């Protein structure tokens, strides 16, 4: 009996040690990933101060950054006020003199994977420090989101459901509220369909969730004729069709399987540059970084997106990539190489740099 008990103890010991070793390896790996990819440096210096949720009423850049002192990150010089229109004057996306331009003629600062913020619990490899609602107040008029089906529930996630999610209802209610409070603003929302996070994404189910938010789908523009010109900003504002949505990596919206109204196929109407850049030097090599993806599919493409971020995301490098001088030169180089006007400048860590300021500079020049 004693030998039998000893053998049993030996078996338990043999089974236990591998489990302990595996657990230790997983713990160390998690710590390394968190240290390497999460913006710990910036998080620690502020201990993520008591961020105020956005109220929906625009009162300037203070709304975007809450109680973060001007001398702390985010490093936006003088907290540029995107809304440049004088009271009582015609206004479109913060400027008075661009309303006559079509929506496919102007530039939009676009938050890449906008849902994946450290503030909203995306701790492993977040794309942003602060949530997307603040980006709207800061002047970002492009919001890129990834749709996932997590255990039957459609949410916004990045990569895997376990790495963080944001509710579709919550995000779109915030966007809808922002537009209600800012009736001169027009938004671009490119959606990536992620069918690999868990289950497949059903766009009809996604659209149904959108219809549950009062007034949201009424603001969604539908481009009925692929060859027709896109509306001007003024036409979008006057008709209150101020949300322009696109999707990619999902259904192809053929006649036999049409997509919900207003969910346009991105590859049909837009084209992007390369996006897999490991360091700043990769981005600076415009001979390759400005190359077009799927350029053989050019047909009715009216929009041109320039990717301006690293993979995996880099908080430190984003300060340079999102600076006015760097982004201005990248837009110029890619536009010249592709012979296309840039519409989307996709960025991580939107709170760094000054892309909204560059956008207003760029769009103001277009109006001259």
Language-model segments: residues:
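Catalytic cores of phosphodiester-bond hydrolases, prominently lipid phosphodiesterases
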Residues: 2-4, 17, 21-368
